[in-house]
Amino acid sequence: MRQKIVAGNWKMNGQIQQVTELVSQIEELIGFDCAAQVAVMPPSIYIPKVRDCLKTGKVVVGAQNVYPKDYGAYTGELSAPMLKDFDCRYVLVGHSERRQFFHEDENFVAQKFHHVKDHGMIPILCVGETLSERENGKTEQVIAQQVLAVSAKGKDCFRDCVVAYEPVWAIGTGKTATPEQAQKIHQFIRDLVGEINDSDAKHLTLIYGGSVNENNAKALFSMPDIDGGLVGGASLNAKQFVEIVKCIN
């Protein structure tokens, strides 16, 4: 059975009081048996604080970014061993904002992906097309390139990882793919991975990220190949985020 996941990407938002209150409210509101693994990904400076605030075991902490070296002269960066010291379970790699603003290419994303796996954490590989790429019929071509970039290490590379489909045109815009559009791409990704390792494809957790909110989550999560969500803006509101989590049930 595939792991269901709802992950909140807080991006560069919040200060210590807001972060503390938000994570405490989320835990308090999840007073039910949850079918999904719930994760929050605060700005890296607040990872220790969030970890220390988590009391119930119903929410885990993750990281938004990583640098693919264990240590060294890489000013301002954080390695997987450092993140693991603070109990990070998930790490985002390849988010469209990293690709766009920091010019991270496929090779660099692949290095991050395997660096996270090599240190016993779970990478969430983000893939997705821009509006221009979609309008030009290149969606599957772009996503295949992004997915297959991490496959150089062999047929087991998609074991113990998550892939998030985040159409770039839907991030922070209020637009979202229809459940049917999202399902089509999720099925494409699963079939693509199946060409490498059929067993891993069947067990691969695929989540959708692209303006997920409490109004569209239930329809999205009802699709057969959508196993949860990567939530942006709505994860900064505890009530909205937990309403999304409830939709997994």
UniProtKB/Swiss-Prot annotation:
CDD domains documented for this protein: TIM
Pfam family, one: TIM
InterPro entries the UniProt entry points to: Aldolase_TIM, TIM_sf, TrioseP_Isoase_bac/euk, Triosephosphate_isomerase, Triosephosphate_isomerase_AS
EC code(s) of this entry: 5.3.1.1
GO molecular function, one term: triose-phosphate isomerase activity
Main localization category: cytoplasm
Swiss-Prot/TrEMBL catalytic activity: D-glyceraldehyde 3-phosphate = dihydroxyacetone phosphate
Subcellular location: Cytoplasm
Function (record text): Involved in the gluconeogenesis. Catalyzes stereospecifically the conversion of dihydroxyacetone phosphate (DHAP) to D-glyceraldehyde-3-phosphate (G3P).
Transmembrane segments: none
Binding site residues for substrate: N9, W10, K11, G172, S211, G232, G233
Disulfide bonds: none
Signal sequence bounds: none
Keyword terms of this UniProt record: Cytoplasm, Gluconeogenesis, Glycolysis, Isomerase
Pathway it works in: Carbohydrate biosynthesis; gluconeogenesis; Carbohydrate degradation; glycolysis; D-glyceraldehyde 3-phosphate from glycerone phosphate: step 1/1
Location of the active site: H95, E166
Family that this chain belongs to: Belongs to the triosephosphate isomerase family.
A biological process term (GO) from this entry: gluconeogenesis
GO cellular component: cytosol
Subunit structure: Homodimer.
Protein known as: Triosephosphate isomerase
